A protein has these predicted regions:
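Short coil/turn segments
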Residues: 32-35, 239-247
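Conserved core of the PLP fold type I
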Residues: 26-165, 170, 176-200, 204
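Conserved small/polar residues in nucleotide/adenosyl-binding loops
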Residues: 255-257
Length: 257
């Protein structure tokens, strides 16, 4: 599991649907640049069913696994506001994400959340965010490799601090609904997967098919951008791309290329 390979057979419904799609000729055409409409609609519905959060289909972006989703997210976040060029990692997390930051020439800072649980989390976030250089912060919840879950109190603290310092939160949900202390697998019924999205509009969710559906080989995932963030224009993006919003830049200028 630490390597993201549960060793379970891929969900049969996915295998059957993929076979049918190939037989119907999907391999012969390029998908819509914004993402296949059916996939976007079902991703939005999935998020409502299991997280109880409303995100419009336009903000549910199919990606080649969460690896591509986080890479593009880091890249856009670091271009939004001049002076905000650093990503804050709430560790432990996925080491490859730090390598992504290194590849794109950004900076990152990090701290181990083990020493800052509960209200202590607010103090350490204040210490980092008050410097004004943090473009986004990222964490994994449920967490790999430490196998703990952030509490609702801690998620609210992260959301509150994101609002206070206008910082984007990237929530890595690779191990979606794997807090097995709760029955999280019933669609449209509480309890739901915990999320920072209840406490801020400055969020991006990374949802991977690798673990949730044991579909690692196909590298599928969805980056879900909040409605408010999707439609927000940033000075840095306007200067670099001549216009557009966070969401349109993410899709047309990053994912498409």
């Amino acid at each position: 599991m630490e390597m993201g390979v549960p060793g379970l057979k891929a969900a049969q419904v996915g295998v059957d649907a993929e076979i049918k799609a190939l037989q119907d000729g999907v391999a012969s055409i390029y998908p819509n640049i914004n993402g296949t409409s059916d996939v976007k609609a079902e991703a939005s519905r999935f998020i409502k069913a299991f997280i109880d959060i409303d995100i419009a289909p336009e903000g549910c972006v199919p990606v080649t696994g969460s690896m591509q989703g986080t890479y593009a997210s880091f890249l856009v976040c670091g271009q939004c506001t001049p002076g905000k060029d650093t990503i804050l990692f709430i560790d432990p997390g996925f080491p490859v994400q730090k390598q992504q930051i290194t590849v794109m020439g950004y900076r990152y800072e990090s701290f181990d959340v083990y020493e800052y649980r509960g209200e202590k989390l607010r103090d350490i976030l204040e210490q980092y965010l008050s410097k004004g250089n943090i473009a986004a912060m990222i964490y994994s919840n449920p967490n790999n490799p430490a196998w703990f879950c952030l509490t609702e109190e801690e998620l609210k603290i992260i959301g509150d601090m994101a609002n206070k310092y206008d910082t984007i939160v990237i929530e890595d949900l690779a191990y979606f609904a794997m807090d097995f202390r709760k029955p999280l697998g019933k669609p449209f019924e509480a309890p739901f997967q915990a999320t920072v999205a209840r406490y801020t509009d400055n969020y991006i969710l990374q949802i991977s098919g690798s673990k949730a559906f044991s579909y690692a080989g196909q590298r599928i995932g969805v980056t879900a951008i909040s409605d408010k963030l999707y439609h927000r224009a940033y000075p840095g993006l306007t200067q670099r791309y001549g216009g557009g919003t966070f969401g349109t830049v993410y899709i047309l200028s990053l994912i498409h290329i």
